[in-house]
Amino acid sequence: MKDCDYVIHVASPFPSAPPETEDEVIAPAVNGTKSVLEACAKSGTVKRVIVTSSVVAIHTGNQDKGYMLTEKDWAVLESCPPYEKSKVLAEQSAWEFVKTLPDEQKYELVVVNPGYMLGPIIHGSNCTSMEIHRRMLQREMPMLPKLQLAISDVRDVATAHVKSLTLPDAPGNRFIITSGSMWMREFAQTLRREFTSQGYSIPTTYCPKFGLRVMSLFDKSVKSVIPNIGKVVNVSNEKMIKELGITPTEMEKSIIDMAYSMIDEGFVKRTKGYNGNQSRNNENNS
């Protein structure tokens, strides 16, 4: 961190299936964050640090409470599966660490809390955020879990990090970055409207809960979603809009842009009828 003024810490394990033990995700998340913050404190030059947490550190265990969750809310730790718990503990340890720094080592802290990140891909690596798209487009999931997700566009999340670095009133704040919440059926219907004519068969039927329990015996990734079946995710993006000045990207655009980029980059097989993103091509030609 020598000679650095600003640091953004974005890395944290995001498993596609439940780990064998909690420590597989909790220890890297907490210790990794602590190591970055310690290095910043020793640098003598770092003025502000942005830590990427998650909206799960806010809504887990608080779904269906009947009110809009904000940055003031914290997940119920006892209700958290390992990944969600890792995000809560890593963020809480970050706030506590900075709070206890001596004056000569103090720096400003901002935390960004995105949801399930979607949008175009700019790298050649597979990641957990691609799983829903890949399974739907390739019909690897014949039925859907009745799951609601807080959707974030990766471009909005990137903008939030930059604004968190530069805005004078950002330090000491958490910022939920989301375009809104969407049920899996709405997600699938968005893909279906765009891609059925291009040869993709997208499932839109919900799987009953007992069916998911049976599937979880053979697919560990299914097990992790069962506790959240049917639960409403109601989180506010007011601070994102009013304080960071970010207009949320429409969820449908995030979903469609990600699908096209996954197909174009080879993460999803092209059908014979695939035409590419015509709206993007039209924008480029206009």
Q: What are these language model-derived features?
A:
Residues 1-31:
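NAD(P)H-binding glycine-rich loop region in Rossmannoid oxidoreductase-like domains
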Residues 26-30, 67-92, 126, 147-152, ...:
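Short-chain dehydrogenase/reductase
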Residues 54-81, 122, 137-138:
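Active-site "gating" loop of Rossmann-like NAD(P)-dependent oxidoreductase/epimerase domains
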